[in-house]
Design a protein with these regions (language model features):
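Ferredoxin-reductase
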Residues: 147-212
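Globin-like tetrapyrrole-binding proteins
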Residues: 1-153
Length: 212
């Protein structure tokens, strides 16, 4: 539970986030990857290049600030993001790294306007929000392990490719260990993580499951 003073301080930063949120998140990602290049194995590099990830994070941070006194209001957003995090293998230990770099970016962009009180308040708020994400994601990880499922990634092999049209190709895959797979439900997708020739880091792409 956040103190009222912390809530008031966070809400007071909303105008600054509205004005500088995108700059903060761009700075955040630059610092994050410079200091932790291994995280490039997790994040979608195409979304980074096109600025989608920076914009999405800026909107999320702003929403958290605006609803810091009623975080239940952002639970639907948290759940949506948590599903994506689970699909990419985001772990609890990543949140400490992200938090440190987010606070650093806020200070770097806002300068003297980011007082010690503001940085401390955002540190406390981030801790609460991170705990919510970690809890939701752990539930998702546990659910993914049920009925033939697995946590994180599993090796598959391509057994068949079918060109359905000029734009669509169906890829049929089977687990390397030969174990049976859980039955997929409508709307589910799978993250394919693979090495790509000429690329230094792993590439992640989400694909819709059409048959299980």
């Amino acid at each position: 539970m956040l103190k009222q003073q912390t809530i008031d301080t966070i809400k007071a930063t909303v105008p600054a986030l509205q004005a500088h949120g995108l700059t903060i998140t761009k700075t955040f990602y630059t610092n994050l990857f410079n200091e932790n290049p291994s995280l490039l194995n997790i994040f979608n590099q195409t979304n980074q290049t096109k600025g989608r990830q920076q914009g999405a994070l800026a909107n999320t941070v702003l929403a958290a600030a605006m609803h810091i006194d009623n975080l239940e209001a952002i639970v639907p957003v948290v759940v949506k993001i948590a599903h994506k995090h689970r699909s990419l293998g985001v772990l609890p230990e990543h949140y400490e790294i992200v938090g440190a770099n987010l606070l650093k970016a806020i200070k770097e962009v806002l300068g003297d306007a980011a007082t010690d009180e503001i940085i401390e308040a955002w540190g406390e708020a981030y801790g609460v929000i991170a705990d919510i994400f970690i809890s939701v994601e752990e539930d998702l990880y546990k659910a993914s392990e049920a009925a033939g499922g697995w946590r994180l990634f599993k090796q598959f092999k391509i057994v068949r490719k079918v060109a359905e049209s000029d734009l669509i190709t169906s890829i049929y895959m089977a687990p390397v260990d030969g174990e049976p797979l859980p039955i997929a439900t409508a709307g589910q997708y799978v993250t394919v993580r693979a090495t790509v020739p000429g690329k230094e880091y792993l590439m992640n792409r989400q694909y819709t499951i059409t048959q299980s």
